[in-house]
Protein backbone atom coordinates (compact mmCIF):
# COMPACT_ATOMS: atom_id res chain seq x y z
CA UNK A 1 0.00 0.00 0.00
CA UNK A 2 1.73 3.14 -1.22
CA UNK A 3 1.27 5.94 1.30
CA UNK A 4 0.96 8.51 -1.47
CA UNK A 5 -1.82 6.56 -3.14
CA UNK A 6 -5.21 8.00 -2.39
CA UNK A 7 -7.48 5.73 -0.40
CA UNK A 8 -10.55 7.37 -1.88
CA UNK A 9 -11.02 4.78 -4.61
CA UNK A 10 -10.63 1.69 -2.40
CA UNK A 11 -11.63 2.58 1.18
CA UNK A 12 -15.20 1.64 2.00
CA UNK A 13 -17.26 -0.71 4.08
CA UNK A 14 -17.78 -4.06 2.32
CA UNK A 15 -20.71 -3.75 -0.06
CA UNK A 16 -23.25 -6.34 -1.14
CA UNK A 17 -25.39 -8.49 1.12
CA UNK A 18 -23.32 -11.64 1.71
CA UNK A 19 -22.15 -12.90 5.12
CA UNK A 20 -19.08 -10.63 5.10
CA UNK A 21 -20.94 -7.49 4.01
CA UNK A 22 -21.24 -4.41 6.18
CA UNK A 23 -25.03 -4.69 5.97
CA UNK A 24 -24.88 -8.10 7.67
CA UNK A 25 -22.24 -7.03 10.24
CA UNK A 26 -23.28 -3.55 11.34
CA UNK A 27 -24.45 -4.53 14.84
CA UNK A 28 -21.42 -2.77 16.35
CA UNK A 29 -22.21 0.59 14.74
CA UNK A 30 -25.89 0.06 15.61
CA UNK A 31 -25.01 -0.20 19.31
CA UNK A 32 -22.92 2.97 19.06
CA UNK A 33 -25.76 4.87 17.44
CA UNK A 34 -28.21 3.71 20.09
CA UNK A 35 -25.96 4.92 22.91
CA UNK A 36 -25.30 8.27 21.25
CA UNK A 37 -28.93 8.94 20.24
CA UNK A 38 -29.89 10.90 23.41
CA UNK A 39 -26.91 13.21 22.91
CA UNK A 40 -27.69 13.58 19.20
CA UNK A 41 -31.29 14.48 20.04
CA UNK A 42 -30.14 17.14 22.50
CA UNK A 43 -27.69 18.53 19.95
CA UNK A 44 -30.35 18.83 17.25
CA UNK A 45 -32.74 20.48 19.70
CA UNK A 46 -30.11 23.16 20.32
CA UNK A 47 -30.28 24.46 16.74
CA UNK A 48 -31.71 27.96 16.52
CA UNK A 49 -34.84 27.92 14.36
CA UNK A 50 -37.29 30.78 14.15
CA UNK A 51 -40.66 31.28 12.51
CA UNK A 52 -40.20 32.25 8.90
CA UNK A 53 -36.75 30.68 8.55
CA UNK A 54 -35.62 28.98 5.34
CA UNK A 55 -38.32 26.95 3.56
CA UNK A 56 -36.21 23.82 3.78
CA UNK A 57 -33.43 22.52 5.97
CA UNK A 58 -30.36 20.72 4.66
CA UNK A 59 -28.81 17.80 6.50
CA UNK A 60 -25.63 15.92 5.59
CA UNK A 61 -24.50 12.50 6.79
CA UNK A 62 -20.76 12.31 6.09
CA UNK A 63 -19.16 8.87 5.90
CA UNK A 64 -22.67 7.45 5.63
CA UNK A 65 -21.69 3.91 4.53
CA UNK A 66 -24.75 1.70 3.85
CA UNK A 67 -27.52 -0.08 5.72
CA UNK A 68 -30.20 0.67 8.28
CA UNK A 69 -27.83 2.59 10.56
CA UNK A 70 -27.50 5.31 7.93
CA UNK A 71 -31.26 5.83 7.70
CA UNK A 72 -31.72 5.60 11.47
CA UNK A 73 -29.38 8.55 12.01
CA UNK A 74 -31.02 10.92 9.54
CA UNK A 75 -34.52 9.86 10.58
CA UNK A 76 -33.65 10.86 14.15
CA UNK A 77 -32.46 14.27 12.94
CA UNK A 78 -35.55 14.84 10.77
CA UNK A 79 -37.93 13.70 13.52
CA UNK A 80 -36.40 15.99 16.15
CA UNK A 81 -36.34 18.96 13.79
CA UNK A 82 -39.96 18.31 12.81
CA UNK A 83 -41.11 18.34 16.44
CA UNK A 84 -39.09 21.48 17.12
CA UNK A 85 -40.67 23.25 14.15
CA UNK A 86 -44.15 22.14 15.24
CA UNK A 87 -43.63 23.90 18.57
CA UNK A 88 -42.45 27.05 16.80
CA UNK A 89 -45.50 26.95 14.50
CA UNK A 90 -47.91 26.56 17.40
CA UNK A 91 -48.41 22.83 17.16
CA UNK A 92 -49.42 22.75 13.51
CA UNK A 93 -47.82 20.45 10.97
CA UNK A 94 -44.73 22.34 9.71
CA UNK A 95 -44.49 23.12 6.00
CA UNK A 96 -40.72 22.85 6.21
CA UNK A 97 -39.11 20.38 3.82
CA UNK A 98 -35.93 18.44 4.51
CA UNK A 99 -33.11 17.67 2.10
CA UNK A 100 -30.67 14.96 3.15
CA UNK A 101 -27.28 14.43 1.55
CA UNK A 102 -25.74 10.98 1.97
CA UNK A 103 -22.01 11.41 1.45
CA UNK A 104 -19.14 8.95 1.40
CA UNK A 105 -16.15 8.07 -0.72
CA UNK A 106 -16.86 7.13 -4.34
CA UNK A 107 -15.93 3.54 -3.43
CA UNK A 108 -19.02 3.30 -1.19
CA UNK A 109 -21.83 1.08 -2.46
CA UNK A 110 -24.25 3.92 -3.27
CA UNK A 111 -26.35 1.59 -5.44
CA UNK A 112 -27.08 -0.59 -2.41
CA UNK A 113 -27.70 2.49 -0.28
CA UNK A 114 -30.36 3.99 -2.51
CA UNK A 115 -31.86 0.62 -3.34
CA UNK A 116 -32.42 0.14 0.40
CA UNK A 117 -33.84 3.65 0.69
CA UNK A 118 -36.35 2.95 -2.09
CA UNK A 119 -37.42 -0.25 -0.36
CA UNK A 120 -37.70 1.54 2.96
CA UNK A 121 -40.02 4.29 1.72
CA UNK A 122 -42.01 2.10 -0.67
CA UNK A 123 -45.67 2.53 0.14
CA UNK A 124 -45.09 5.27 2.72
CA UNK A 125 -44.65 9.01 2.51
CA UNK A 126 -41.04 10.08 2.23
CA UNK A 127 -39.98 12.29 5.13
CA UNK A 128 -37.15 13.91 3.21
CA UNK A 129 -35.62 14.39 -0.22
CA UNK A 130 -32.39 12.44 -0.66
CA UNK A 131 -29.24 12.86 -2.73
CA UNK A 132 -25.83 11.20 -2.85
CA UNK A 133 -22.61 13.19 -2.67
CA UNK A 134 -19.46 11.15 -3.39
CA UNK A 135 -16.16 12.51 -2.10
CA UNK A 136 -13.80 12.72 0.86
CA UNK A 137 -14.99 14.65 3.90
CA UNK A 138 -11.43 15.89 4.28
CA UNK A 139 -12.27 18.19 1.35
CA UNK A 140 -15.06 20.66 0.61
CA UNK A 141 -18.26 18.91 -0.47
CA UNK A 142 -20.89 21.67 -0.40
CA UNK A 143 -21.26 25.40 -1.16
CA UNK A 144 -20.57 27.93 1.55
CA UNK A 145 -23.26 28.27 4.22
CA UNK A 146 -25.33 25.45 2.72
CA UNK A 147 -25.95 23.04 5.62
CA UNK A 148 -27.95 23.28 8.84
CA UNK A 149 -26.99 19.93 10.38
CA UNK A 150 -23.96 17.74 9.72
CA UNK A 151 -23.54 14.33 11.33
CA UNK A 152 -20.68 11.90 10.95
CA UNK A 153 -21.02 8.57 12.70
CA UNK A 154 -18.16 6.11 13.26
CA UNK A 155 -16.12 7.48 10.36
CA UNK A 156 -13.58 10.06 11.53
CA UNK A 157 -11.22 7.46 12.97
CA UNK A 158 -10.40 6.59 9.34
CA UNK A 159 -7.51 8.71 8.11
CA UNK A 160 -7.11 10.27 4.68
CA UNK A 161 -3.94 8.24 4.16
CA UNK A 162 -1.36 6.07 5.88
CA UNK A 163 1.28 8.47 7.26
CA UNK A 164 4.21 8.66 4.84
CA UNK A 165 6.74 8.30 7.67
CA UNK A 166 5.32 4.88 8.52
CA UNK A 167 6.13 3.66 5.01
CA UNK A 168 9.78 4.77 5.04
CA UNK A 169 11.70 1.50 5.27
CA UNK A 170 14.37 1.58 7.96
CA UNK A 171 13.16 4.81 9.59
CA UNK A 172 12.21 5.02 13.27
CA UNK A 173 8.59 5.41 12.21
CA UNK A 174 8.58 2.32 9.97
CA UNK A 175 5.87 -0.06 11.22
CA UNK A 176 7.75 -3.28 10.51
CA UNK A 177 5.97 -6.49 11.53
CA UNK A 178 2.57 -4.96 12.18
CA UNK A 179 -0.44 -3.83 10.20
CA UNK A 180 -1.77 -1.38 12.79
CA UNK A 181 -0.37 0.75 15.62
CA UNK A 182 -1.56 -1.03 18.76
CA UNK A 183 1.68 -2.08 20.45
CA UNK A 184 3.82 -0.35 17.82
CA UNK A 185 6.88 1.80 18.52
CA UNK A 186 6.32 5.29 19.90
CA UNK A 187 7.50 6.91 16.67
CA UNK A 188 4.90 4.97 14.65
CA UNK A 189 2.08 6.07 16.94
CA UNK A 190 3.32 9.67 16.80
CA UNK A 191 3.25 9.59 13.00
CA UNK A 192 -0.37 8.41 13.09
CA UNK A 193 -1.27 11.06 15.68
CA UNK A 194 0.23 13.76 13.50
CA UNK A 195 -1.74 12.59 10.47
CA UNK A 196 -4.94 12.30 12.52
CA UNK A 197 -4.55 15.85 13.82
CA UNK A 198 -3.95 17.22 10.34
CA UNK A 199 -6.97 15.36 8.99
CA UNK A 200 -9.35 16.49 11.73
CA UNK A 201 -8.35 20.13 11.31
CA UNK A 202 -8.94 19.87 7.55
CA UNK A 203 -12.33 18.27 8.18
CA UNK A 204 -13.33 21.08 10.54
CA UNK A 205 -12.13 23.82 8.20
CA UNK A 206 -14.31 22.42 5.42
CA UNK A 207 -17.36 22.12 7.65
CA UNK A 208 -16.81 25.65 8.98
CA UNK A 209 -17.33 26.90 5.44
CA UNK A 210 -20.34 24.70 4.70
CA UNK A 211 -22.43 24.98 7.90
CA UNK A 212 -24.59 28.05 8.54
CA UNK A 213 -23.99 30.07 11.70
CA UNK A 214 -26.07 28.45 14.41
CA UNK A 215 -25.96 25.09 12.65
CA UNK A 216 -24.99 21.85 14.37
CA UNK A 217 -22.04 19.53 13.86
CA UNK A 218 -22.34 16.13 15.55
CA UNK A 219 -19.37 13.75 15.48
CA UNK A 220 -19.18 10.18 16.75
CA UNK A 221 -15.80 8.54 16.28
CA UNK A 222 -13.66 5.74 17.61
CA UNK A 223 -11.69 7.03 20.59
CA UNK A 224 -9.54 6.06 23.52
CA UNK A 225 -9.45 7.06 27.21
CA UNK A 226 -7.65 10.25 28.16
CA UNK A 227 -4.04 9.60 29.08
CA UNK A 228 -3.96 6.18 27.44
CA UNK A 229 -0.90 5.51 25.30
CA UNK A 230 -2.63 2.48 23.78
CA UNK A 231 -5.31 2.72 21.11
CA UNK A 232 -7.47 0.14 22.92
CA UNK A 233 -8.33 0.88 26.52
CA UNK A 234 -7.84 -2.46 28.30
CA UNK A 235 -5.68 -5.57 27.68
CA UNK A 236 -8.58 -7.99 27.07
CA UNK A 237 -10.17 -5.72 24.50
CA UNK A 238 -6.80 -5.10 22.88
CA UNK A 239 -6.32 -8.83 22.35
CA UNK A 240 -9.77 -9.29 20.81
CA UNK A 241 -10.07 -6.15 18.69
CA UNK A 242 -10.44 -7.07 14.98
CA UNK A 243 -7.41 -4.93 14.02
CA UNK A 244 -4.95 -6.42 16.51
CA UNK A 245 -3.79 -9.90 17.52
CA UNK A 246 -5.76 -12.10 15.13
CA UNK A 247 -5.07 -9.78 12.21
CA UNK A 248 -1.32 -9.76 12.85
CA UNK A 249 -1.34 -13.56 13.23
CA UNK A 250 -3.23 -14.06 9.97
CA UNK A 251 -0.76 -11.89 8.06
CA UNK A 252 2.15 -13.74 9.67
CA UNK A 253 0.59 -17.05 8.58
CA UNK A 254 0.75 -15.87 4.96
CA UNK A 255 4.41 -15.00 5.46
CA UNK A 256 5.26 -18.29 7.20
CA UNK A 257 3.53 -20.29 4.47
CA UNK A 258 5.53 -18.51 1.79
CA UNK A 259 2.45 -16.95 0.22
CA UNK A 260 3.82 -13.42 0.63
CA UNK A 261 7.16 -11.89 1.56
CA UNK A 262 7.67 -10.02 4.83
CA UNK A 263 8.16 -6.85 2.84
CA UNK A 264 4.67 -7.26 1.38
CA UNK A 265 3.17 -7.60 4.86
CA UNK A 266 5.14 -4.60 6.11
CA UNK A 267 3.74 -2.48 3.28
CA UNK A 268 0.17 -2.73 4.56
CA UNK A 269 -1.11 -0.51 7.36
CA UNK A 270 -4.66 0.09 8.55
CA UNK A 271 -5.36 3.86 8.30
CA UNK A 272 -7.19 4.22 11.62
CA UNK A 273 -6.39 6.34 14.68
CA UNK A 274 -8.44 6.60 17.87
CA UNK A 275 -8.24 10.11 19.33
CA UNK A 276 -8.72 11.32 22.90
CA UNK A 277 -11.19 14.05 23.86
CA UNK A 278 -8.22 16.37 24.41
CA UNK A 279 -6.93 15.81 20.88
CA UNK A 280 -10.38 16.52 19.44
CA UNK A 281 -10.87 19.67 21.54
CA UNK A 282 -7.43 20.97 20.54
CA UNK A 283 -8.23 20.57 16.85
CA UNK A 284 -11.58 22.36 17.24
CA UNK A 285 -9.91 25.19 19.15
CA UNK A 286 -7.18 25.55 16.53
CA UNK A 287 -9.69 25.59 13.67
CA UNK A 288 -12.08 28.05 15.28
CA UNK A 289 -15.64 28.66 14.16
CA UNK A 290 -17.21 26.05 16.45
CA UNK A 291 -18.27 26.02 20.09
CA UNK A 292 -18.30 22.61 21.77
CA UNK A 293 -21.64 22.03 23.47
CA UNK A 294 -20.90 18.61 24.89
CA UNK A 295 -18.35 15.81 24.75
CA UNK A 296 -19.07 12.31 25.98
CA UNK A 297 -17.04 9.12 26.25
CA UNK A 298 -19.05 6.02 25.38
CA UNK A 299 -18.09 2.42 26.11
CA UNK A 300 -19.63 -0.09 23.72
CA UNK A 301 -19.82 -3.77 24.62
CA UNK A 302 -18.90 -6.25 21.90
CA UNK A 303 -22.01 -8.03 20.59
CA UNK A 304 -20.54 -11.39 21.67
CA UNK A 305 -20.02 -10.46 25.31
CA UNK A 306 -21.97 -12.89 27.49
CA UNK A 307 -22.30 -15.46 24.70
CA UNK A 308 -18.85 -17.01 25.07
CA UNK A 309 -19.92 -20.24 26.74
CA UNK A 310 -22.43 -20.90 23.97
CA UNK A 311 -19.93 -19.98 21.26
CA UNK A 312 -17.33 -22.40 22.63
CA UNK A 313 -19.64 -25.25 21.58
CA UNK A 314 -19.15 -24.26 17.94
CA UNK A 315 -15.74 -22.56 17.63
CA UNK A 316 -15.76 -22.74 13.83
CA UNK A 317 -18.92 -20.66 13.64
CA UNK A 318 -17.38 -18.23 16.10
CA UNK A 319 -14.27 -17.97 13.94
CA UNK A 320 -16.30 -17.30 10.80
CA UNK A 321 -18.34 -14.67 12.60
CA UNK A 322 -15.23 -12.82 13.77
CA UNK A 323 -13.69 -13.03 10.30
CA UNK A 324 -16.87 -11.68 8.70
CA UNK A 325 -16.93 -8.80 11.16
CA UNK A 326 -13.33 -7.92 10.29
CA UNK A 327 -13.99 -8.21 6.55
CA UNK A 328 -16.96 -5.85 6.74
CA UNK A 329 -14.59 -2.99 7.50
CA UNK A 330 -11.29 -4.10 6.01
CA UNK A 331 -11.85 -6.34 2.99
CA UNK A 332 -11.97 -3.56 0.34
CA UNK A 333 -8.57 -2.09 1.24
CA UNK A 334 -6.99 -5.51 1.83
CA UNK A 335 -8.24 -6.77 -1.53
CA UNK A 336 -6.97 -3.66 -3.31
CA UNK A 337 -3.53 -4.47 -1.87
CA UNK A 338 -3.38 -8.29 -2.00
CA UNK A 339 -5.88 -9.20 -4.70
CA UNK A 340 -8.93 -11.48 -4.28
CA UNK A 341 -7.14 -14.82 -3.86
CA UNK A 342 -4.73 -13.81 -1.11
CA UNK A 343 -7.44 -11.77 0.60
CA UNK A 344 -9.62 -14.89 0.77
CA UNK A 345 -6.70 -16.86 2.23
CA UNK A 346 -5.93 -14.13 4.77
CA UNK A 347 -9.43 -14.09 6.22
CA UNK A 348 -9.66 -17.88 6.15
CA UNK A 349 -6.61 -17.91 8.41
CA UNK A 350 -8.15 -15.17 10.50
CA UNK A 351 -11.22 -17.38 11.02
CA UNK A 352 -9.06 -20.38 11.97
CA UNK A 353 -7.11 -18.27 14.44
CA UNK A 354 -10.32 -16.89 15.95
CA UNK A 355 -11.81 -20.38 16.32
CA UNK A 356 -8.76 -21.44 18.34
CA UNK A 357 -8.60 -18.17 20.29
CA UNK A 358 -7.98 -18.82 24.00
CA UNK A 359 -9.22 -15.31 24.76
CA UNK A 360 -12.77 -16.22 23.72
CA UNK A 361 -14.01 -16.03 27.31
CA UNK A 362 -12.78 -12.47 27.75
CA UNK A 363 -15.14 -9.56 27.21
CA UNK A 364 -14.32 -6.86 24.69
CA UNK A 365 -15.27 -3.18 24.83
CA UNK A 366 -14.88 -0.34 22.35
CA UNK A 367 -14.43 3.32 23.24
CA UNK A 368 -16.28 5.96 21.25
CA UNK A 369 -16.28 9.74 21.61
CA UNK A 370 -19.35 11.84 20.81
CA UNK A 371 -18.99 15.59 20.28
CA UNK A 372 -21.73 18.11 19.57
CA UNK A 373 -20.69 21.58 18.42
CA UNK A 374 -22.45 24.70 17.17
CA UNK A 375 -21.19 26.84 14.30
CA UNK A 376 -20.45 30.34 15.67
UniProtKB/Swiss-Prot annotation:
Mg(2+) binds at residues 175, 179, 265-266, 268-269. It comes from the Eukaryota. The keyword Calcium does not apply. It catalyses: gibberellin A9 + S-adenosyl-L-methionine = O-methyl gibberellin A9 + S-adenosyl-L-homocysteine. Its EC number is 2.1.1.275. It is an enzyme of class 2 (transferase). Methylates the carboxyl group of several gibberellins (GAs). Substrate preference is GA9 > GA20 > GA3 > GA4 > GA34 > GA51 > GA1 > GA19 > GA12. No activity with diterpenes abietic acid and ent-kaurenoic acid. Overexpression of GAMT1 results in dwarf phenotype. PANTHER family: S-ADENOSYL-L-METHIONINE:CARBOXYL METHYLTRANSFERASE FAMILY PROTEIN (PTHR31009). Belongs to the methyltransferase superfamily. Type-7 methyltransferase family. SABATH subfamily. This is Gibberellic acid methyltransferase 1.
Amino acid sequence: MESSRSLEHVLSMQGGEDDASYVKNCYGPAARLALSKPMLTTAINSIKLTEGCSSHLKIADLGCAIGDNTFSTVETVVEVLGKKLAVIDGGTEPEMEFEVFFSDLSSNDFNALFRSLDEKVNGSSRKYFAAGVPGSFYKRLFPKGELHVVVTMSALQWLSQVPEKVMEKGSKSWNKGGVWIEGAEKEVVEAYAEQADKDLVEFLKCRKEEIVVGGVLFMLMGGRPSGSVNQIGDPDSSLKHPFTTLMDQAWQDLVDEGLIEEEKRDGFNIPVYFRTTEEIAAAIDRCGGFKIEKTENLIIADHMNGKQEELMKDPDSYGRDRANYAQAGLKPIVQAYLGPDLTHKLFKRYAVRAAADKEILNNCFYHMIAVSAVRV
